[in-house]
Structure formats: structure tokens, C-alpha cells
A protein has these predicted regions:
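Internal helix-loop-helix
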Residues: 1-28, 32-33, 82-86, 97
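Alpha-helical interface subdomain recognition
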Residues: 1-5, 9, 17-18, 32-33, ...
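Active-site lining segments that contact anionic ligands and/or coordinate catalytic metals
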Residues: 34-36, 52-54, 62, 84-86, ...
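Short Pro/Gly-enriched beta-strand edge/turn motifs at strand-loop
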Residues: 35-41, 70, 123-129
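Flexible, glycine/threonine-enriched loop-and-boundary segments that flank and lead into catalytic domains
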Residues: 38-79
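Short Gly/Pro-enriched turn/cap motifs at secondary-structure boundaries
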Residues: 45-48, 78-80, 97, 133-140
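A short core secondary-structure module
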Residues: 64-122
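A glycine-rich, basic-preceded beta-loop-alpha segment at the flavin cofactor/substrate interface
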Residues: 73, 113-128, 133, 140-174, ...
């Protein structure tokens, strides 16, 4: 569920703030599921303090940016279950204001997109490790390195220095999804507990209503 959840957030961010060119390049295949999306905020030295983001973006003559930095705890940050991964990355344009007021949002594809719309050459973004987690093991959580070989190509979403505003579009979508996921997990846990209690035979009721051991669901502590 986490992979389409994040992809949906990327779709919403591009629909809201992306240029016509970005929409034409990425939306169709994100919506179809051929490509997946990620959300890149957290950094090793900053944690969730986005004011301390150091990933930098250097403007290029063609209107693109070169992205340099490290992002951690990236859900579905690396996998081969889709043709391309479209990373939405918070970074600071060189010379931007300090703090959260100087953060911008960029599209950084795993593979560059060719004129025919298909994935082309590998972009300069690489997975350097996968987290070993206690749970949610079907979802790869990655550390991503941008720009080790000259700079990852990124494309500005919306306007410079408004990245946090745009990222909240993704974050709010994710919050709704995680809330629904929590309700679903709790409901499933309850159903399994009830089924177990109905099948588990454990001693006779203290009120003597049964002569032999019965299901533990009749125990006062379980009722």
C-alpha cells in the first residue's frame, strides 16, 4: 500500500504545482503505475528538521538543476518493480534564504526520460543502502545519494523557495493514507483475536455453566 500511496502524493504535487512540461512528461505513467514516486525530505544531519536541509541545487543553462546530497529513510526509494522511479526531492538552490524559506522541490527521475517518453540513461542518483527494519519488510526503505558523478539532473516544481509548501501536498496525502492503514490493521487484528478466542479451548467457565473446557472467549477477562 505504501508504494501507490507515495505515487499518489507525487501525482497530486505535480498536478498542483508542476509545469505543463512536467505534467506531460510524468503524470500519465505515474497514474498508470508504470512509474512510481517517492518523497525525499530527511537527511542524516537534519533528521526531520527541514530547516537544516543541505541538499543543494545548482541552476543549469538549460533550465534544469544539478542536485547534490544525501536523503535517508526513503520509502520505496529503490526497487525494480517499475520502469522508472520519480523522486520528489527537497533541496536548497545556491544562494537561497536560510531555513525552510529557502527550500525548493525538484523532480529527479531515476532514469532520464527520452523524447519518446520512455526511460533512457541512468540519472546520477543511487541507492547506497537499504534499512533493516523491524516491520513493513515488503517496503524497501533506502538511503539515496544524489550527485556523486557530476550531479543528478533535477527539474524545479513550481517556484523556487516554495518547496515546503508543495511537499505538504504529498505529506498530507500520505497522512490520510497512513490513518486509513492504521484503522485497517487494527480491524484485522481485532478480527483475528476474536477468531482465535472462539477456537482456543482453555479451562471451564468459573460459573460452572460448562462441564468441560470451553472456548476462552467465554472467560470474563476476554469478554
Amino acid at each position: 500500500a505504501l508504494c501507490p500511496l507515495l505515487t499518489d502524493g507525487a501525482i497530486e504535487a505535480l498536478l498542483t504545482a508542476g509545469s505543463d512540461e512536467l505534467k506531460a512528461t510524468y503524470l500519465e505513467k505515474l497514474v498508470s503505475g508504470q512509474w512510481t514516486g517517492t518523497m525525499n525530505l530527511t537527511e542524516p544531519q537534519a533528521g526531520s528538521d527541514l530547516a537544516a536541509v543541505r541538499t543543494r541545487a545548482e541552476p543549469q543553462p538549460d533550465g534544469s538543476y544539478k542536485i547534490f546530497g544525501t536523503k535517508i529513510f526513503i520509502t520505496w526509494g529503490e526497487h525494480d518493480m517499475a520502469e522508472n522511479i520519480i523522486h520528489l526531492v527537497l533541496a536548497r538552490v545556491v544562494g537561497a534564504p536560510e531555513g525552510v524559506k529557502g527550500i525548493s522541490l525538484f523532480v529527479v527521475p531515476k532514469f532520464m526520460v527520452k523524447p519518446d517518453g520512455n526511460p533512457g540513461a541512468r540519472n546520477d542518483v543511487h541507492c547506497v543502502s537499504i534499512e533493516h527494519k523491524m516491520g513493513i519488510k515488503a517496503s524497501p526503505t533506502a538511503v539515496l545519494q544524489f550527485g556523486d558523478h557530476g550531479g543528478a539532473v533535477g527539474y524545479l516544481v513550481g517556484q523556487e523557495n516554495r518547496g515546503l509548501e508543495y511537499m505538504f501536498i504529498m505529506m498530507n496525502a500520505a497522512r490520510y493514507g497512513v490513518g486509513v492503514q492504521g484503522i485497517a490493521i487494527a480491524q484485522m487484528a481485532y478480527q483475528k483475536a476474536v477468531a482465535f478466542a472462539r477456537d482456543r479451548v482453555q479451562s471451564r467457565p468459573v460459573d460452572g455453566s460448562l462441564k468441560a473446557a470451553g472456548p476462552i472467549i467465554h472467560h470474563p477477562d476476554v469478554k
